[in-house]
Amino acid sequence: MLAGDLKFINETIGIQGFSSTYCCPYCLKKKPWTGPHAELRTLGHIRKHAREFKEKLDSGEKEWRDAPEFFSSVNQPLYDEPDWTFILWLIPIPELHLLIGIINKICDVLNFRWSKLSGIKDRFYKWADKKAKLQRQSYRDKSFNGPTCKKLLDKKLRLLRRALPYCLRDFLLLFNSIDRIRHACFGQKLFPSYKNEIENFGNLWSAFKIDITPKVHVLLDHVPVFCAHHNKGLGYFNEQVLLKTKHFSFHLLIHLLI
């Protein structure tokens, strides 16, 4: 197994980034991520469609905009495992990147709705900066990093509750829900409640009428399957793969430089 953030994963398996139609590294579900679970990606599926895409591209029959016809598979994966290998078993789900992405999405939506209600631009982020001492990182497109996301969940929700207008306090349900998921299956141990916690989060997300992002899709569709298969929390795997990742990253660097 190897590890990386979702952008890194997509690059190494040969599919397009998260603005593409079929951008999930683990399955063939397309935006807007509605409906039942989709077929899981395999290395063989990506290899086949990337090869066909290149042939059509070279012959002039297809253009880059036609990549969705090939499930956004545009390059050969940088892995040697057999064709039948599922990406979900090959590359563990990066729990920290899920947490960061989902927390920042909740914050963005809360900021928009609070700003609209109050008439004050960036109302939530001004509260976070001045009252909660939670600073966004400019190098991360003005988003909270991992430690700041955890600080918000661990230490600042009571303070936020006091600051929020009553009609927006339901956002605390979302923050508390992702926090329960973090404790249930994002660490090295897996707790029995993880499936219910993820299902409850999905119901809340739907009730808030927030668009499903790639990271929310991965959480809802793939984290329960991965954890049930291995009977361990996500953190266990991302601890185990560090040495292998160092070895792989060296070969990836050589590949990218050539």
Q: At which residue positions do the language-model features occur?
A:
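A structural signal for the principal folded core domain
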Residues: 1-258
